[in-house]
Each structure stands twice: as C-alpha cells, then as structure tokens.
Amino acid sequence: PFQPEKVSFQAGRIMLNRIKKLISERSTFAFETTLTTKSYVNIIKVAKAKKYKIILFYFWLNSVELALARIEDRVKKGGHNIPNNVVIRRYTRSLENLVNIFIPICNEWSIFDNSTDKMNLIAEGTRLSNSLILDNQQWEQIYAYKS
C-alpha cells in the first residue's frame, strides 16, 4: 500500500475493465485520469457509439515545477510520491494528448486553471469548432502542445 507505483499498471487495468462493464450496463459514470495514456481513446469511441455524451474537465497547472511542488507538499502530509522524471514526462504528455487526441473526440470540454487557490475557467467548447476562450494567454500556453 505504500508503493503505489508498483501496482499502477494493475490498477489501470482494473479501472479500464470497470469502465467497460459500466458502459455495457449503460450506467452513468465519471473517472479521473492524467490523460497520459491513449488507453481511453477506444473506450470513449465505444461509449460514443452507444450514445454516451463524453464531457471532459481538465484541471491544468501552469508549470511542471508547480506540479512537483504540490507532490512534495502532499508527501510531507503523508501522501504518496511520484518520481520527478515521471511527473515531468506526464506533464508534457498530458497536454499533448489533451489538445491532439481528447478534445477532438469529446462532445464537450472545459479547461480550468488550477494553479492558484481560486480555480478559473480558461476555455470550453464542443470539439474545436465551437469554443469559448476566456483566457487567451493561458489557452495559447496549452494549445502550444498541438502537433
């Protein structure tokens, strides 16, 4: 229980199987992910084919340094650690996957700045064709990961 990184793959498999079961039962559900893997792409496509409405809420941090600092703070409070190299890799991959893969396949999406005590909506939309950008500077930082 004190080494979550050793069971993360197994936990991910369990979660994917649970999501598949919920879809087959036509249940309403939500799940949390860092978007660092493409494992959810096919599941989202299957869910959409079964008339699910896919809504994405993305909570963005404005720097990898802030992500590292928050993890350090969590560890000091007794929470689990994530190695720095993993955090750095995930930060970039998450943003790349957000703008290149997940925004285009979700019915609706909202991106929030979670860098301060007060969370702010940066942008929201229905795919990329109908979007409302509320903070152009932050949106440009995020959208810079588009390939």
Positions of PLM-derived features:
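Conserved substrate/cofactor phosphate-moiety recognition/catalytic segment
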Residues: P1-S27
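A short acidic, amphipathic alpha-helical/loop segment
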Residues: N42-V46
